[in-house]
Amino acid sequence: MAIISSNIGDNDFSFRKKELRLVDSKNIPEEKRNNNLNLARPLNLKEFIGQEQLKSSLRVAIDASIIRKEPLEHTLLYGQPGLGKTTLAFLIAHELNTKCRIATAPAIERPRDIVGLLLGLKEGEVLFIDEIHRLNRLTEELLYSAMEDFRLDLTMGANRGARCRTINLPRFTLIGATTKLASISAPLRDRFGISQKIEFYTCDELKQIIVNFSRLINLNLEDEASYDLAKISRGTPRIALRLLRRVRDYAQVVMKTNTISVNLIKKALNSYQIDEKGLDSLDRHYLSFLNQNNNIPIGLDSIASGLGDDSSMLEFVVEPYLIKIGFLTRTPRGRLLTALGKKYIDSKDDNF
């Protein structure tokens, strides 16, 4: 949820520093430490809810690698944040009966960092690199021979004293995860034998995830309430579970109950400024800004400047869901509010 000062007027789109949005699909430290969330993770591909086509393809590839006693081909998983890329990497390693070693691309700052990771691998292990599109060029180039030939080609020394050294590596599987497929260079992308998109989840799939987690945390969740929560979770399990935890907080602290009803969910989400579409204050301010421009396309940088926000954040965090539900369209000339989006925002009080 975007926390916006109550002093902001209807026509003032300059935001102060924001806290976490409940409907932001990015992970946060609290969620990484949450034991209940870790317990809620599936233990194998069969337990993983949703992504049926992806699971079927992975099942065939995994079984084939086991039959041939070869490492699984390098795998690239791409899609919006919060859809389960990291979980799938762990499950793939589990199905292969091997370890999964984790790294994030921003933490691999120098070539020696990736060298250390590769030299630490054992035969058949999985190396998972999150945000792989953020690898720097030198680090990425070291991966080429490692992925293709399971070797490192290193240059030692400098100038006339430079010499090449080749280090053989154990056969391993690299799993890369990215939210920005287009940002991955073609040479790196082409070295992945398996490339799979993780799609948004259906309401029924999210409902099952919510119900399973509510049982884990001993929460009495009414059937219709679980579906209502699934509908506003933006097709993203991470958001669904985050909203459920905040609704639980409201139920236990404000309403003094452990039973979650449809009416209680409405009250809880209203207190967090989230409406029946799953949109929060930032979404509504974005739509209101477009609505003020009388159906004239607006460039992303102009929108970011008008809202006092980061253009990259708007493009990759705010806009995808607004496009998905038909409220926003992107044109060569800029962003346009659709008729559906205009009808929605005209019906809303900007102060919610």
Swiss-Prot record:
Keywords: ATP-binding, Cytoplasm, DNA damage, DNA recombination, DNA repair, DNA-binding, Hydrolase, Nucleotide-binding. Has 3 domains, the large (RuvB-L) and small ATPase (RuvB-S) domains and the C-terminal head (RuvB-H) domain. The head domain binds DNA, while the ATPase domains jointly bind ATP, ADP or are empty depending on the state of the subunit in the translocation cycle. During a single DNA translocation step the structure of each domain remains the same, but their relative positions change. This is Holliday junction branch migration complex subunit RuvB. GO terms for cellular component: cytoplasm; Holliday junction resolvase complex. It comes from Prochlorococcus marinus (strain AS9601). The gene is ruvB. Coiled coil: none annotated. Residues 202-273 are annotated as: Small ATPAse domain (RuvB-S). NCBIfam families: PRK00080.1, ruvB. GO terms for molecular function: ATP binding; ATP hydrolysis activity; four-way junction DNA binding; four-way junction helicase activity. Pfam families: AAA_lid_4 (PF17864), RuvB_C (PF05491), RuvB_N (PF05496). Homohexamer. Forms an RuvA(8)-RuvB(12)-Holliday junction (HJ) complex. HJ DNA is sandwiched between 2 RuvA tetramers; dsDNA enters through RuvA and exits via RuvB. An RuvB hexamer assembles on each DNA strand where it exits the tetramer. Each RuvB hexamer is contacted by two RuvA subunits (via domain III) on 2 adjacent RuvB subunits; this complex drives branch migration. In the full resolvosome a probable DNA-RuvA(4)-RuvB(12)-RuvC(2) complex forms which resolves the HJ. The keyword Transferase does not apply. The RuvA-RuvB-RuvC complex processes Holliday junction (HJ) DNA during genetic recombination and DNA repair, while the RuvA-RuvB complex plays an important role in the rescue of blocked DNA replication forks via replication fork reversal (RFR). RuvA specifically binds to HJ cruciform DNA, conferring on it an open structure. The RuvB hexamer acts as an ATP-dependent pump, pulling dsDNA into and through the RuvAB complex. RuvB forms 2 homohexamers on either side of HJ DNA bound by 1 or 2 RuvA tetramers; 4 subunits per hexamer contact DNA at a time. SMART domains: AAA. DNA binds at R330, R335. It is found in: Cytoplasm. Its EC number is 3.6.4.-. Mg(2+) binds at T86. The keyword ATP-binding applies. GO terms for biological process: DNA recombination; DNA repair. Belongs to the RuvB family. ATP binds at R41, G82, K85, T86, T87, E148, D149, F150, R191, Y201, R238.
